[in-house]
């Protein structure tokens, strides 16, 4: 390797984020030896150790921490360069098919699609909502071009590009907020919970948050719509745990108190595509907007 491999740099950042080679390999759809080889080659190129094992997994060395900081800036420069070059092209057109969850569709994707329509009026984006498993299957079968889904994902020959961490927050009606002194699993499990329906990735994540502290959930309601959940909470029928993006805007959080949980609960969203998918100008434009929504 005669130049710094940006792909290996991205793998290194993911290894540190996930805390192990195996976890990074699962996200990337690679074998653990393949991930380890990329890190070794990166270390050989830089002639220094970048990672070390601890009792809690993999962590960056001092040199690795420095590389992480530079890596974020390198990625930003690369993204800026791509955006600048593409500014000379005015023929972004065609149709993209995208799958995502209902919450991300409404609260994250909608403003991005509006911006995409302004910037590239000849580009059409068709959106399908569903759960992560169904979206990944559709991508593998080439029925969708790409997905914006929750990690982890498992699939054959997929490119996985983490784009953002999404926090989950506690919500209750403003009239009832004084009844909730602590927002821990132990304190909340006895309170009436209005939950997402069983079988969704969101429900599994919340179940896991309680289970990690030895607490079993006993929801008083299980609903499939986040808007229905918020209506029930506003009516004072219980509390819920929802993605922060669903209550980010003033109109979305009207009548609700919104607070972070202890410990914090979050998940990671990623853009997923087939590795053999041709990266059209339209797909590239949409990926850039998802990665940097404020800079589009």
Residue ranges and their predicted role:
Residues 155-162, 166, 180, 227-275:
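Beta-alpha-beta core module
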Residues 178, 192-213, 279-287:
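Secondary-structure junction motif
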Residues 13-31:
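Short helix-boundary/capping micro-motifs
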Residues 43-65:
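A short LG(V/I)-centered, amphipathic sequence patch enriched
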Residues 131-136, 140-144, 149-150, 201-257:
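Hydrophobic hinge/microswitch elements
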Residues 93-156:
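Central regulatory/effector-binding core of bacterial HTH transcription factors
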Residues 108, 257-296:
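A late-sequence structural motif
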Residues 155-193:
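Flexible hinge/capping segments at coil-to-helix
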């Amino acid at each position: 390797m005669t130049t710094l491999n940006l792909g290996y740099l991205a793998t290194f950042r993911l290894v540190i984020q996930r805390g192990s080679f195996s976890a990074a390999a699962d996200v990337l759809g690679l074998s653990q030896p393949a991930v380890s080889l990329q890190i070794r080659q990166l270390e050989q190129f830089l002639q220094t150790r970048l990672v070390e094992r601890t009792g809690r997994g993999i962590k960056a060395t001092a040199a690795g921490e420095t590389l992480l900081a530079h890596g974020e800036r390198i990625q930003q420069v690369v993204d800026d360069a791509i955006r600048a070059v593409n500014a000379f092209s005015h023929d972004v057109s065609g149709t993209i098919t995208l799958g995502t969850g209902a919450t991300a569709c409404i609260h994250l994707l909608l403003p991005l699609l509006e911006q995409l329509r302004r910037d590239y009026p000849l580009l059409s984006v068709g959106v399908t909502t569903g759960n992560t498993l169904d979206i990944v299957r559709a991508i593998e079968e080439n029925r969708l071009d790409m997905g914006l889904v929750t990690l982890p994902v498992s699939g054959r020959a997929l490119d996985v590009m983490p784009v953002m961490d999404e926090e989950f927050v506690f919500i209750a009606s403003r009239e009832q907020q004084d009844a909730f002194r602590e927002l821990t699993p132990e304190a909340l499990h006895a309170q009436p919970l209005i939950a997402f329906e069983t079988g969704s990735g969101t429900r599994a994540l919340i179940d896991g948050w309680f289970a990690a502290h030895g607490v079993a959930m006993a929801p008083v309601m299980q609903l499939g719509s986040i808007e229905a959940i918020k209506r029930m909470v506003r009516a004072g029928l219980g509390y819920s745990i929802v993605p922060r993006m669903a209550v980010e805007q003033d109109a979305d959080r009207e009548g609700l108190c919104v607070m972070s949980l202890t410990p914090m609960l979050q998940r990671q969203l990623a853009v997923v595509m087939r590795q053999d998918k041709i990266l059209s100008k339209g797909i590239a434009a949409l990926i850039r907007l998802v990665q940097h929504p404020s800079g589009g």
